[in-house]
């Protein structure tokens, strides 16, 4: 059995868990998330804990049990605390601002880049060079942050571009004569 799957997921007070066949729904103060659990995984919900066990005789059942446990743990954390991603814009003239549910980015192109945030993700710009994204869905917020970063990835010579707040960009040395 996977080491990750051996640890049960504790369900805090104020969080409702509904298990309908292989469909697991978690509801909390930050919203509601649901996920289909793989058929090779047996899920049990009792005494405010969720346990995951691989079904016998199925290939990769151990791995699926560990994956399911990690995903459900992220769902529980998401509906209680939520997830935050911070992006920084580095470069002369690089700016961001919120227009309703859309992030307007000036990234040195001849046009402004408008990125609409999907339902379940909220954004704010405390300064012109900073974007803060918040969501209950860890996968969704990571994808949105990656999409925004992909407009102008940090380049290796000056480090200009959109980067995660905790990202370290390795700077290359310029060519010598």
Swiss-Prot record:
Record keywords, A-Z: Ribonucleoprotein, Ribosomal protein, RNA-binding, rRNA-binding
One GO location term (cellular component): cytosolic large ribosomal subunit
Lineage top rank: taxon: Bacteria
GO biological process, one term: cytoplasmic translation
InterPro entries: Ribosomal_uL6-like, Ribosomal_uL6-like_a/b-dom_sf, Ribosomal_uL6_a/b-dom, Ribosomal_uL6_bac-type, Ribosomal_uL6_CS
SUPFAM superfamilies membership: Ribosomal protein L6
Molecular function in Gene Ontology: rRNA binding; structural constituent of ribosome
PANTHER family, per the entry: 60S/50S RIBOSOMAL PROTEIN L6/L9, LARGE RIBOSOMAL SUBUNIT PROTEIN UL6M
Biological function: This protein binds to the 23S rRNA, and is important in its secondary structure. It is located near the subunit interface in the base of the L7/L12 stalk, and near the tRNA binding site of the peptidyltransferase center.
HAMAP family linked to this entry: Ribosomal_uL6_B
Subunit structure: Part of the 50S ribosomal subunit.
Family that this chain belongs to: Belongs to the universal ribosomal protein uL6 family.
The name this protein goes by in its record: Large ribosomal subunit protein uL6
């Amino acid at each position: 059995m996977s080491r990750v799957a051996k640890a049960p997921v504790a369900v805090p007070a104020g969080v409702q868990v509904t298990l309908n066949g292989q469909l697991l729904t978690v509801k909390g103060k930050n919203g509601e998330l649901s996920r289909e659990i793989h058929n090779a995984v047996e899920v049990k919900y009792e005494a405010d804990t969720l346990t995951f066990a691989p079904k016998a005789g199925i290939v990769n059942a151990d791995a699926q049990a560990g994956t399911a446990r990690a995903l459900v743990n992220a769902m529980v954390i998401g509906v209680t605390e939520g997830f935050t991603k911070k992006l920084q814009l580095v470069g002369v003239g690089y700016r961001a601002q919120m227009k309703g549910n859309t992030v307007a980015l000036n990234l040195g192109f001849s046009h402004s880049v408008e990125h609409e945030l999907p339902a379940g993700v909220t954004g704010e710009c405390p300064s012109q060079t900073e974007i803060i994204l918040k969501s209950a869905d860890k996968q969704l917020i990571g994808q949105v942050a990656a999409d925004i970063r992909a407009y102008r990835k940090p380049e290796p010579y000056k480090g200009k571009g959109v980067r995660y707040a905790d990202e370290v960009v390795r700077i290359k040395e310029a060519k010598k004569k």
